[in-house]
């Protein structure tokens, strides 16, 4: 891969690099910018991660740079790791001394020794991340590429600098990183490297769930996430990190009737949705929307394959999966549960005559997330029949139009009935009890069904009439 030397210089002419150069020469240490920042110069990608390796003490170099940057610089030293960080405004520099590493079989924590630049490049995960640019004045901007990282970028290839079995056994997270880079960059994984991932897949079990989720999130947020999940499936990692997604694979046939491969369908939905949103948790909703289909799959000789209530069962499965995978057990989880629970509703609406009542109930149940729900449901139309797709999308358009009209007229999104439980108890001198709940629910349903408008006077009159049928008399 050719890139003009002037282009390289353009990326390392800023004041921070000049200061690092001066400080390194004063300390008589070699200093290099290495890793992702250099890689992204050649890929013409913006990058804020600036990693500096010093052949000597990275901490001492960081201290010298911080002094030169003055009062605006904030220095953090991590002595146990032999690293330091310098922050000044938006600038963030990471410093480390060149080192060589070795690992024990059951840990990602390396045994670290001082080393040369070559040692440091040897320990890098992939050849494209082992590129280094010298910052010392006499060799300023000189590229050090011992493993053919530039050639691999030219060939769009992810490859390890050393024996991939050693690389992945030493640090199994690198298997996830290989797949993540391939997904983000649109690269291929070198066959020997990919085969080594398959051989070492079980080693992923020593990696913390949090680190795995960090990589999965980056895959989910990539332009075409299906690439990553296909690779995770093909190398055998997927059953270790997300067995419920892996369980969607396969097609079963009975009496000549088959069903679609729900794994392939899920990835197609995810890709389609990714074209319309960068919302991480909405994209995760695509991965979870059919997660209960294996548990609900039944064959009916009259109906064929059914997956009854897979949306409700899926909603109930989510907390256990989130807990196991160390996904957040907070509003984000509840949001995904809502998306999974409701994802069949707009499709049902689009497949039949759309009533005002059904629209009101959808607006009420989905609340502020109704637009996200519609995006998910539109992405869920993956039929190979173009006429069917066209019909569904046209019906979705009508659903959206009707939603807009009803929302403006009835204000039912996130609405609370105009009559509260407290007012019901006060009106009829009731303690907290079933009749209070029955009346409140009846008022809500009357509004959603269009029996009464979403207004206090109408709701109050409806309450009195319904209460009379329940032999309840107001005390005021």
Model segments located where?
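Catalytic cores of the polymerase beta-like nucleotidyltransferase superfamily
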Residues: 1-476
């Amino acid at each position: 891969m050719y890139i003009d030397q002037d282009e390289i210089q353009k990326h390392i002419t800023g004041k921070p690099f000049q200061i690092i150069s001066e400080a390194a020469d004063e300390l008589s240490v070699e200093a290099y910018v290495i890793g992702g920042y250099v890689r992204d110069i050649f890929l013409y990608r913006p990058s804020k991660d600036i990693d500096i390796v010093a052949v000597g003490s990275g901490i001492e170099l960081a201290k010298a740079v911080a002094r030169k940057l003055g009062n605006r610089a904030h220095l953090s030293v991590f002595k146990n790791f032999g690293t330091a960080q310098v922050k000044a405004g938006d600038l963030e520099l990471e410093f480390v001394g060149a080192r060589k590493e070795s690992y024990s079989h059951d840990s990602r924590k390396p045994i670290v020794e001082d080393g040369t630049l070559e040692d440091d490049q040897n320990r890098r995960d992939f050849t494209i991340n082992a590129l280094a640019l010298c910052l010392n004045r006499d060799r300023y901007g000189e590229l050090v590429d011992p493993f053919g990282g530039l050639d691999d970028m030219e060939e769009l290839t992810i490859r390890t600098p050393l024996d991939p079995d050693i690389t992945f056994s030493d640090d199994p997270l690198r298997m996830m990183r290989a797949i993540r880079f391939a997904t983000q960059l649109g690269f291929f994984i070198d066959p020997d490297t990919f085969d080594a991932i398959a051989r070492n897949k079980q080693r992923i079990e020593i990696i913390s769930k949090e680190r795995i989720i960090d990589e999965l999130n980056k895959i989910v947020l990539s332009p075409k996430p299906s690439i990553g999940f296909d690779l995770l499936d093909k190398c055998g990692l997927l059953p270790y990190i997300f067995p419920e997604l892996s369980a969607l694979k396969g097609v079963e046939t009975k009496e000549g009737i088959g069903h679609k491969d729900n794994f392939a369908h899920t990835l197609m939905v995810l890709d389609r949705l990714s074209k319309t949103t960068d919302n991480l948790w909405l994209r995760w909703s695509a991965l979870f929307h059919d997660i209960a289909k294996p548990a609900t799959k039944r064959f009916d000789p009259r109906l064929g394959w059914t997956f009854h209530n897979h949306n409700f069962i899926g909603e109930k499965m989510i907390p256990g999966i989130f807990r196991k995978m160390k996904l957040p057990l907070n509003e984000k989880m509840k949001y995904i549960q809502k998306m999974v629970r409701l994802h069949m509703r707009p499709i049902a609406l689009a497949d039949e005559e759309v009533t005002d009542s059904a629209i009101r109930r959808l607006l009420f149940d989905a609340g502020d997330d109704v637009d996200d729900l519609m995006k998910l449901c539109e992405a869920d139309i993956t039929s190979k029949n173009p006429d069917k797709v066209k019909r569904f999308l046209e019906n979705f358009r009508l659903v959206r139009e009707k939603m807009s009209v009803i929302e403006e007229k009835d204000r039912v999104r996130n609405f609370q009935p105009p009559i509260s439980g407290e007012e019901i108890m006060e009106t009829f001198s009731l303690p907290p009890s079933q009749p209070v709940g029955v009346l409140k629910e009846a008022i809500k349903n009357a509004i959603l069904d269009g029996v009464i408008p979403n207004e206090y006077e109408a709701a109050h009159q409806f309450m009195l009439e319904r209460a009379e049928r329940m032999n309840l008399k107001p005390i005021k």
